[in-house]
Curated annotation (Swiss-Prot):
Pfam families: HAMP, SpoIIE. GO terms for molecular function: phosphatase activity. It comes from Synechocystis sp. (strain ATCC 27184 / PCC 6803 / Kazusa). PANTHER family: STAGE II SPORULATION PROTEIN E, STAGE II SPORULATION PROTEIN E-RELATED. The lineage of its organism: Bacteria, Bacillati, Cyanobacteriota, Cyanophyceae, Synechococcales. This is Protein IcfG.
Amino acid sequence: MKMKLIQPFIQSIRFRIVGLLLLCLIPPTLGGIFLIDSYTGRQLKKIAEQDLQSRARLIIQLISRSDRERQQSTAFVASQPAIVEFNVEASQYFLNEFIKFHQWNGFFVVANQEGELVAGSDGANQEKGLPLKHWFEEVKDKNRHLNRLFPGKTYAESKDCLIVPIHSKNDQTQIGIVVECIPLPVIADFVQKILKDAELERILLVNYEGYIYADTDFKNYGVLENKKKSPLVNRLLNDQSGFVYSQGKFSYLSPVHLRGAKTWGLIVENSESDIQAAILNVNRIGYLLVLVIGGIVAYASWMVIHHSTVPILDLTKASQAIAAGDLDYEININQGNRQDEIGILGNSFIYMKNQIKTLIAQEVKDGVNRLELEKGRQIQQNFLPISLPDLQQWQINAVFEPARSVSGDFYDAFLLGDDYLAIVIGDVCDKGVGAAMFMGLFRSLLRVFSGETMPGDTCIRDVNYKCSANDGNGKKKVIVQFLNAVRLTNDYIATEHGDMAMFATLFFGVIDISNGNLSYINAGHEPVFILNSEGIKHRLKSTGPAVGMMPNSTFTIDSLKIDPGEMLIGYTDGVTDARSPTKEFFGRQRLMETLTANFSAKTEILDIIKQELIGHIDGSIQFDDITMIAVYRN
C-alpha cells in the first residue's frame, strides 16, 4: 500500500497544535486586554494629572519670574539719581523713557515722605485716590518693598501696585517711595497668553485676599470679584493642593507663594475627553494586537513549532535568570552556529546581556561619583557660616558661588570676645570631597585655636608670651594669640596629615572693632585690598607660606588701620581666574577697576562683582568656586 505523504489539512498535527494554541491564547488575551484597559485608564489618568501638575508648576515659574523681574525693574527705578533727588523734570523724563523702552503696560508714581506726588509717568496724574502717605508708612515700617491691590469701581480700573522705598544716598534713610501699578486686564492678557502656550482650557489666578486677578473663562470682566468664600479658593488660600473632577473636566489646585511668602492660588483646568480618547485608542490597538498576534502565532507554530520552541524556551529561562539578577547565566542558544533568525536572536540576546552588565557597572560608577560630589557639596555648605556678625559700626557681606564640582573655597567671620572681629578667606588645594573635608578641618581648627570657642575673658597662652590683664601689651599679645591659630593649624595639618599633601592658602585678619586696627597673616593667598572712595589704598600681600605645607613655618603678622569709610575686600583665585567663552581671564586688574568704580555700593559691591563675573563667563563652564568677603567700616 502506497504511503500517503500529504495529510488532509484538518487532520494535521500542526493544525491541531495551532488551533489549541489559539484557543489557549485568545480568551486570556481578551481578559488581559480588559485588565490592561482598566490599568491603562488609571495610568493615563495619573499621567494626565502629572502633566497638568507639571504645567501648573511651569506657569508658577513664569508668574514668579515675571514678578521678580518687575520687582528688580522697580528697584532699579528707585535707585536712579533723578528719582532719589526728587528732580521733577528729570524724573518724569526718565519714567516715560523707561516705560517706552521696556514697553511697560503700567505707570510709575514718585512720592515724598509726606505722601505728596513728586513726579509720575504720562497718565499717572489721572490716577486718584492712591494712598501714597499710607503706603510710605507701611514700607518704612516693614523696611522692604510691598505689593498692594488698588481696587477700582470695575475690574478694568483695578490695579496691582508695587511700592519700593527710595533711600537717600548718604545715610540710606527712606525719603520716599516709587509706586508702579499695572492694570489687572494686563495681567489677565498675560495669563491668556500662557493659557494658549500651555494648551489648557482654563487658568484662574487669585491673590492672597481671594480677589480674582485673571480667569480665562471670562472674556469681559465686570466688577472685581472676591472668591475667598468659594470652597476651591478657600482650599488654595489655606495652602492645600489637589485634583478636582467635575462635569467632564479635571482641575489642579496649586497654592503659589509670592511676595513675602504670601499664599496666592492657581487653578488650571483641562477636559477629560482627551483621556477617554486615549483609552479608546489603547482598546483599538489592543484588539488589533490580538488579531496580529494570533496570526503570527498560528503561522509561526505551523512553520517552526518544533524547531523554534526549544531555543525560545531556553531564551525564556535566560531572560528570567537575567531578570532575577543572574547576569552570568550561560546562554547556549547558538552552540551549533545557527545562521537563522533564532541564531541571530541568540547572539543579540548575548550581546544585550553583556551590554546590560556594562551599563549597570557604569551606572554604579556614575552613581558613586554623583554621591561623592553631592556629599562634598553638602559638606561645603554645612561648614560655611549660617549668618555673619551684625555690628553697629561695621558692615559684613560674603558671596559664595560653587562650581559644578566641589572644591575647597571657604570664608568665615566671627567675634573673638566682645572686642575683636575675625575675618577668614581661604582656598584648599585640589578639588573633590577630600578638599571639601579639609576645608571643614581648616575652618574648625582656626576657630578653635583662635579661642573663638573660649569665654571672652580667657587668655590662651602662647609659648612665647604670658598674657596678663595688667600687661601694657596685653591687647597686642591677645591679638598675637588669635593669629597664632594659623601657626597651630599649619603644624597640626603638616604633622598629622602631611602624607595627604593637602594645604590651603588663606588670609586671617583680626580687627579691633573699636578703633579699626587690623592685624593679619596672609598665608600665600591672593592679595587682600583695602580701598576707599579714591581707590585701592593697600594691597595686603603674602606674609608667609601656605598653611599645612611644612611644620614650624614662619608666619609674619602685619598690621594697619581701617579708617571710617574704608573697606576690606578678600577673594579667591576663582574670581580672577574666571574664563570667558574665548578663554580670557577676568583678571586682577579688572577686579580692581570694578572695585574702584563701585565703591559707593559698600559691601553690596560683591553682588556687582558677581554680576560682572556672570557676564564675563557668559554660560561657559565655571572651573572653580567664586568666593568673596567684604568688611566696611561706617
